[in-house]
Amino acid sequence: MSTSLLARRKHLMALGALAAGSVLRASGAAAERAQARVASIGWTAADVLLSLGVTPVAAAEKYNVNVLSVDPRQQLPDNCIELGLTNQPNLELLHALRPDLIVVDSRHLAIENQLQAIAPVFRLNIYGDPGGLPLERACDQVLKLANALDITVRAQRYVASVDASLQDQRKIVDSLGGTPRVLAVQLFMDGRHLNVYGKNSMLDDVMVRLNVQNAWQGATPPGHVPTLGIEELDSMPDTLLLYMSDERYAPIALHNLASSEIWRRLPLVRHGHLAPIPRLYPFGGLNTALQFGRELTDALVRYRKIA
């Protein structure tokens, strides 16, 4: 993407005002909107709110949201009330909290009608229908949500900072004089399978932005993640494998992979063309793009030094 994300979105602010409206405007004065009590249903919803400096008064699956964040500033605090599971939140508790707005992931819409009976609902649609271009859609959705919360200037600065960071990473990658194809994966604990992130994913969009070729070019429906057997990596000998490393699953997966003859014989394994990256949420918002851009660039710099 050669042009600035922020520049491409100047016209979207006007559209966002019409399409999303100011959901809270009916509640009263601007001061009230600025102090809106917001609840989040879905990990992406919580991630996007936190990225805008908005701490939800209540959120579903707080533990999972915090586990997926490596930045303490992007974690839900203790005084954020737990609402339970994303697909079965505690509606009675949510009603008692009387939020001004409920932000919900587009992948958790089964209860949207019930939520609308409690408070206005903002549907965050980064990975839902029609799918595709999650990086671009995340910028759009952040600005529309910010418009609803009357924090437009803050959101514009945030989007601009993400854009600037990706531009900086692109310059570093370009200076390397060529990079390998990259495969971003989540290892399975069974030591036989892995998830790959191809087109229609935030990780692929970041690769495109940094001019890095994704080794996985297979079909990837929006919002889905293909699963491969490790034997399929045999056809990717010149690929740099980036696996998400977390303290819960990665050690078990690596232990089981170490005992696999198939794994040990893979060219990319024999040549040491694999590297861990800190845990991240692949279906997050711009924070995911920001984090993966940095991790991808760092991994490519290290690869170039030892290649």
Residue ranges, per PLM feature:
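Structured C-terminal subdomain patch of bacterial secreted/periplasmic proteins
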Residues: 36-37, 140, 240-307
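Proline-aspartate-enriched helix->loop->beta-strand connector
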Residues: 98-104, 237-239
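N-terminal export signals
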Residues: 2-4, 10-30
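C-terminal segment of N-terminal export signals and the immediately downstream linker at the start
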Residues: 5, 25-40, 44
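A short, structured surface patch at a secondary-structure boundary
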Residues: 37, 43-97
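Extracytoplasmic ligand-binding site segments that recognize negatively charged/polar headgroups
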Residues: 110, 124-144, 177-204, 249-252
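Basic- and aromatic-lined ligand-binding clefts that recognize polyanionic substrates
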Residues: 37-52, 153-210
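His/Asp/Glu-enriched short active-site or ligand-binding loop at hydrolase and phosphoryl-transfer sites
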Residues: 60-61, 200-223
